[in-house]
């Protein structure tokens, strides 16, 4: 029994990290929205489209995520979600490397596509982390405790994102571009890659 519990330490730790990752990737849409406003001289409502795209993806992915859980299980669904998140953030990085003409919104739409794909990942991860933590803990009171702790990490990450984003991106001005957010986006990609390469058993 002791050996079995030890085997659960890494999966539980990874679920905690995924809780934080969900909040971190979602929170990046706020500073990116401010950058979009300056780079494209966008209207205020357009600055929230990245955040909206992230959450609209939940409406499209909620049911498929549940079907994936039933068909391929927690582990493969989580790995798929992390891979999708890596791609989504990668698309946002790509948008920051593209040339554009003033008034042209192609780069903006590519950025929104990345935010939308990232939303797919966050939805899938949300579908995995809560029930899997509960299962790993054996359900009951201990399962609830682990979920509450994971939720606390999610909240802490949400608090850290604006501070870390401000440090990595710096003061946002008319000269700020999406590419200036690359350090923060690279961190999100690195976290995703780490989860893809770590053993899950």
Kindly label every feature range from the protein language model.
Residues 123-149:
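Cytoplasmic helix-loop-helix junction between adjacent transmembrane helices
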Residues 84-101:
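C-terminal ends and interior cores of transmembrane alpha-helices
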Residues 106-124:
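Hydrophobic core of transmembrane alpha-helices in multi-pass small-molecule transporters
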Residues 52-66:
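Central cavity-lining transmembrane alpha-helices of secondary-active solute carriers
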Residues 147-165:
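Glycine-rich segments within core transmembrane alpha-helices of 12-TM secondary carriers
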């Amino acid at each position: 029994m002791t050996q079995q519990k030890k085997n659960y330490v890494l999966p539980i730790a990874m679920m905690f990290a995924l809780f934080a990752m969900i909040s971190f990737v979602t929170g990046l849409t706020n500073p990116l929205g401010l950058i979009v406003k300056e780079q494209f001289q966008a209207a205020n409502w357009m600055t929230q489209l990245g955040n909206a795209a992230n959450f609209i993806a939940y409406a499209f992915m909620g049911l498929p995520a549940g079907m994936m859980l039933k068909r391929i299980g927690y582990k493969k669904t989580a790995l798929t979600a992390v891979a999708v998140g890596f791609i989504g953030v990668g698309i946002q990085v790509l948008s920051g490397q593209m040339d554009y003409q003033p008034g042209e919104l192609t780069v903006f739409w590519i950025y929104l596509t990345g935010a939308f794909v990232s939303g797919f990942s966050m939805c899938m991860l949300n579908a995995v982390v809560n029930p899997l933590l509960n299962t790993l803990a054996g359900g009951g009171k201990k399962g609830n405790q682990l979920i509450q702790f994971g939720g606390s990490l999610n909240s802490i990450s949400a608090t850290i994102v604006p501070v870390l984003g401000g440090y990595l991106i710096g003061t946002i001005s008319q000269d700020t571009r999406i590419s200036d957010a690359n350090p923060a986006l690279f961190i999100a990609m690195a976290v995703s890659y780490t989860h893809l390469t770590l053993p899950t058993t």
